[in-house]
UniProtKB/Swiss-Prot annotation:
Subcellular location: Cell membrane
TM region positions: 20-40, 67-87, 103-123, 125-145
Domain of life per record: Bacteria
Main location: membrane
Membrane-topology annotation of the record: Multi-pass membrane protein
Keywords attached to this entry: Cell membrane, Membrane, Transmembrane, Transmembrane helix
Gene: ygaE
Similarity comment text for this entry: Belongs to the UPF0421 family.
One Pfam match: ArAE_1
The keyword Membrane is annotated on this UniProt entry: yes
GO CC, any one term: plasma membrane
Name of the protein in its database record: UPF0421 protein YgaE
InterPro entries: ArAE_1
């Protein structure tokens, strides 16, 4: 199991909350530690956005718990009923992401009856808020996340895996069921990659120069993900049309294999440029135009010699996927060339997580 920064931040936040609660002299500091667990966030920007909601949820939970405690007295039944009401209110206010904090406050207030219930409720509410603030401080100060490095690493890793399967699929060297399972896994990885991209996008730059560079990087990374998704779409079609491709004209199969081989070679070179390992290679683009023309000519030629409409449709379908994949590669290379031309000092990229 890999220990990430968020795991360490959670531990630091719990420790800080417990120490601060003990130092101030708050009873039951354990509730500050519990609140710190639920309040930790994956990014600094998200911490700024959510802390107001967390404090608001804490206050709502405290008010409702105090009212029910004064009227009916603390009991397990009252804790359950109050929790249901608090959850309903959180959902109505569309701040369901703070339900856990509100419930911690409810339990902290109603778990025991003190002599002065109002003062008891106020102290417990303050204890939970202290846990929330401890997590906010840790998010702000300790171990700022490096989502750019993670984003690049995962983009390259996912793309390389997709290209590996395309090569095997073109040569009919794959087990249908195994490839199907791996395609589903790749879909999940691409969804997680989109989430990492959003976290990176949320990070804020505090200088005008770095803000401009980051905006260029965002466009570049977005296109790299789109291109990887087009490669995945091509793989899905190769897998779905595995038997149909086998019955296509032999010349078209050979031309399609050459075209996809070239696109994968081109994509590999772009990835190498993406991480700053090689220089641009103009001959690759010219060679790609030739393969594109050959694939189109082969399709038109074999379309005239083929009587079955289904084969024509499948040929057109797989060719359209290859053309779309190519267009995204062209756009990606244009963006990389532009970025490396105007921001040469920012081209050194860490690819290790």
């Amino acid at each position: 199991m890999k220990l990430g920064a968020r795991i360490f931040k959670t531990g630091i936040a719990i420790t800080l909350a417990l120490y601060l609660a003990s130092w101030i002299g708050l009873p039951a500091p354990i509730f500050a530690g519990i609140a710190a667990i639920f309040a930790i966030q994956p990014s600094i920007y998200r911490s700024f956005l959510i802390i107001i909601d967390q404090v608001q949820a804490n206050i709502i939970g405290a008010v409702i718990a105090t009212v029910f405690g004064l009227i009916f007295g603390p009991s397990p039944i009252m804790i359950g009923l109050t929790a249901v009401i608090v959850i309903t209110i959180m959902l109505k206010l569309k701040i369901e992401h703070t339900i856990s904090i509100a419930l911690v406050t409810v339990i902290a207030i109603l778990e025991s009856a003190g002599d002065d219930f109002l003062m008891f409720a106020l102290i417990r509410t303050s204890t939970v808020i202290l846990g929330v603030l401890s997590s906010f401080i840790v998010n702000l100060v300790f171990l700022p996340p490096k989502y750019e490095t993670k984003l690049i690493h995962n983009t390259v890793e996912n793309t390389e895996e997709i290209m590996k399967w395309i090569r095997l699929s073109m040569r009919q060297s794959t087990e249908h069921s195994i490839l199907k399972e791996d395609i589903e896994k790749l879909k999940e990885k691409m969804i997680k990659l989109d989430q990492t991209y959003l976290l990176y996008k949320e990070e804020r730059s505090y200088f005008k120069k770095t803000t401009y560079v980051k905006s260029r990087k965002l466009v570049l990374f977005r296109q790299a993900i789109i291109t990887a998704n087009r490669a995945l779409d091509t793989l899905k079609k190769l897998h779905r049309l595995e038997n149909e491709i086998y019955h296509m004209p032999e010349e078209f199969q050979e031309t399609l294999t050459e075209e996809l081989d070239y696109l994968l070679y081109w994509h590999e070179r772009i990835l190498m440029r993406f991480v700053g390992k090689i220089k641009p290679h103009d001959d690759a683009v010219e060679e790609g135009i030739r393969y594109k023309q050959l694939l189109t000519k082969s399709f038109l030629k074999n379309q005239q010699n083929t009587d079955e409409e289904l084969i024509d449709y499948n040929m057109l379908n797989i060719m359209a996927s290859a053309v779309e994949y190519r267009e995204q590669l062209e756009h990606l290379e244009t963006l990389i060339t532009s970025f490396q031309t105007y921001h040469p000092k920012d081209c050194e990229i860490e690819t290790e997580e």
